[in-house]
Amino acid sequence: MNTDRYTVKASEALNDAISLAEAENHGQVEEEHLLHALLSQKDGIISPLIEKIGAKPDFLYDELLQCLRRKPRVTGPAAQTRCAPTLSKACARAERLALKNQDEYVSCEHLLLAISETDSNTARLLHSQGITSKTISAALKDIRGSKRVTSQDPESTFQCLEKYCRDLTTLAREEKIDPVIGRDEEIRRVMQVLSRRTKNNPVLIGEPGVGKTAIVEGLARRIVSGDVPESLKGKRLLSLDLGALVAGAKFRGEFEERLKAVIEAVQKSDGGVILFIDELHTLVGAGASEGSMDASNLLKPALARGELRSIGATTLNEYRKYIEKDAALERRFQQVYCVQPTVEDTIAILRGLQEKYEVHHGVRIKDEALVAATVLSDRYITNRFLPDKAIDLVDEAASRLKMEIESQPVELDQVERKILQLNIEKASLLKESDPASKERLEKLEKELAGFLERRAAMQVQWQNEKGRIEESRRYKEELERLRIEETMFSREGDLNKAAELRYGKIPELEKKIMLLTAEVEKKSGLEGQLLREEVCEEDIAKIISMWTGIPVSKMMASEQQKYLQLESVLMQRVVGQDEAVRVISDAIRRNKAGLSDTRRPLGSFLCVGPTGVGKTELARTLADFLFNDERALTRIDMSEYMEKHAISRLIGAPPGYVGYDEGGQLTEAVRRRPYSVLLFDEVEKAHQDVFNIFLQILDDGRLTDGQGRVVDFRNTIIIMTSNIGSEHILSARESRTHTSDLPVPETQSTEEQTLPEQIRGLLHTYFRPEFLNRIDEVLIFKRLTRKHIRLITDIQLQMVVERLESRHIKLRVRDAAKAYLAERGYDDTFGARPLKRAIQTELENALAREILSGRFRGGSTIVVDMCKDALCFTEQTS
């Protein structure tokens, strides 16, 4: 027996047979051992062959085990396992059969044929199941066709379409493919190309997520329903699984052999099979090593002659990177562009998929949720494409609601925690014997009984609601199953059964679902539901917030009031700049009300004024208000961009330069936090060419970084600060604010009236007109007066108070001390910054010495007052 002439699977079967005989201590390796090994092979051809004949491989396997158990065992040092003469004859016969069939190698089917032709118990067992040489040969012809065994792994080329492809038409017939809404133009174009005589190979090109694969699935559904031209009726649409083709191809040439078998099978179908190759670019280079042919080169001849009809799908970037470089491959495919559907089309697609997702998750999805998913994803998720991102939103929102239904309700959880707390207290009181404890125990037991009763009622209500939701889900699943059956009966022409379902069972089930839904809504109005089963607009907004960090949750009445009072919130930290605060507040309100231009940033402002008047503080306060986090402020010091080449630090270095993969400081910050406040400090210090990148940001709300990615700035607030015109502002008459405790000036000096024009004139000398023209507002920050400094003193001292509270020390500052600090910290030129230094020097330094000396400890209340010409500290006694 020359095992070199055996295939890999046949050699494995012989080795497994020997191992089995040795393990069972059998003296000889016989046909039973070999047949057992052949049936045990996972990816072998024998089990499918026996099934094709009509016998049961499992039954044969069990019978063989019984036979092997009855065989005598040989033990002892002299025991050896030999090959039985009958098995040697069977192997020799298998070799003769291989030569007779002009096969180069002995395969597993030759061994089975040889065993069936022997005069042994194994052959008789096979014959009893109808497995004879004739039935084996007939079944083998169906599986193998006219192929010869020319390699040591022929099994990989048998039934290759079933192994390496998914039958989309079968899936469509079984309604296992989601419905495809719209895309009629693209499907018609694909059918048009497929109907050509040569080069009948369309390739779908589009951005990821626009629905390229869905178009092919739509074509499969049309083929099944017969809504296609005559040339495509009855065709099979198979999706090639390139991963399965490559997997397990250990030796050189195995991959090419498998792919060749697929191509030949498609060619032999005489146009009956259309091959769909998803991610077409993966063919280029697949299987190639050391200059050997790759998959795309194997496909080219068949594609050019029109013998292989295929549909490709790939993204624009991959098509340009891989397919366009291979001109010979590119010309064999006809391009079909798939554009992103509009918002209206996406809403229609979601409405078509709505029922599928409702059945899967067991919840109801409101129409407003579908509209919100489309509109909000289009507005806020800019790095992905419709309809994919909208479908994902609905799917995750429904999944989140399903988890809430299956988890214990919050109200019930709170009652459980309260009961646990009361039980702990009760256990503690039982140890006490004083009258007060006994009285408290009586009250506690009554309270505990009330909570236990409430918990029992809530648990019953929860189980009832869960039961109703589960019942509704079962009804919907049954309804979907009946609809699939009705479609299949209609397609097969069994109109009686189709009519029975359409006019009998389906309407009856729809009525049950309607009554159950009405009952749920009625009960929710009366007793207040513990569980929600409807996905609404608010759920979609929460998922958007989780994905992007953008607070787009629906504005409640309290939140609306919060934005109406925005000025007063900002003025608590930004003093004396009423006009600037009002303008920025109006911009935020316009955005929240949905009135702002969605193609531009939320607001872009140039703040000019002297140092220390609140320009940077306004940006910090705004970030804190919008996100409850000052870290949402991205601050870029423009004095670092005084050279022309420094622009690459903002948007990232171009290809070929050091740092290309790192990205830009500005673009990366916005990509990670798309909803943020951008502060460009001291803009006049940057190089003039740096401002060119602002033109695109301010006008279109977008910027392309060094790697070609488009970064969205539409959800940012851009604040630029500058000290231009500071000398004019300082020389103007003391400005006054419109706060309640400060009088409104009746007249303005000539300098104050001409100040805005002077500032604008100076800005035109520093910045180009196209830059200034794109800014929403130029905010002139006025210099701070003594009264303003007095108000800022309160704000700064409050920060000191909060810092001391962490050490459990209270601080009270008298008015005289505040007035002293305000006077020491007032500087007409430097704004509020000297005040901070004065508080550090006069108050914090002295206070630190007192605390470290041990004079004041935790729990103390320190009073700060004036003693002669300096601050003094005393401890307040209760």
Swiss-Prot record:
One of its GO terms (biological process) is cellular response to heat. Residues 559-783 are annotated as: NBD2. Residues 391-525 form a coiled coil. Residues 159-340 are annotated as: NBD1. Keywords: ATP-binding, Chaperone, Coiled coil, Cytoplasm, Nucleotide-binding, Repeat, Stress response. CDD domains: AAA (cd00009), RecA-like_ClpB_Hsp104-like (cd19499). It is found in: Cytoplasm. Residues 6-71 are annotated as: Repeat 1. The Clp repeat (R) domain probably functions as a substrate-discriminating domain, recruiting aggregated proteins to the ClpB hexamer and/or stabilizing bound proteins. The NBD2 domain is responsible for oligomerization, whereas the NBD1 domain stabilizes the hexamer probably in an ATP-dependent manner. The movement of the coiled-coil domain is essential for ClpB ability to rescue proteins from an aggregated state, probably by pulling apart large aggregated proteins, which are bound between the coiled-coils motifs of adjacent ClpB subunits in the functional hexamer. Part of a stress-induced multi-chaperone system, it is involved in the recovery of the cell from heat-induced damage, in cooperation with DnaK, DnaJ and GrpE. Acts before DnaK, in the processing of protein aggregates. Protein binding stimulates the ATPase activity; ATP hydrolysis unfolds the denatured protein aggregates, which probably helps expose new hydrophobic binding sites on the surface of ClpB-bound aggregates, contributing to the solubilization and refolding of denatured protein aggregates by DnaK. Homohexamer. The oligomerization is ATP-dependent. This is Chaperone protein ClpB. It comes from Treponema pallidum (strain Nichols). The lineage of its organism: Bacteria, Pseudomonadati, Spirochaetota, Spirochaetia, Spirochaetales.
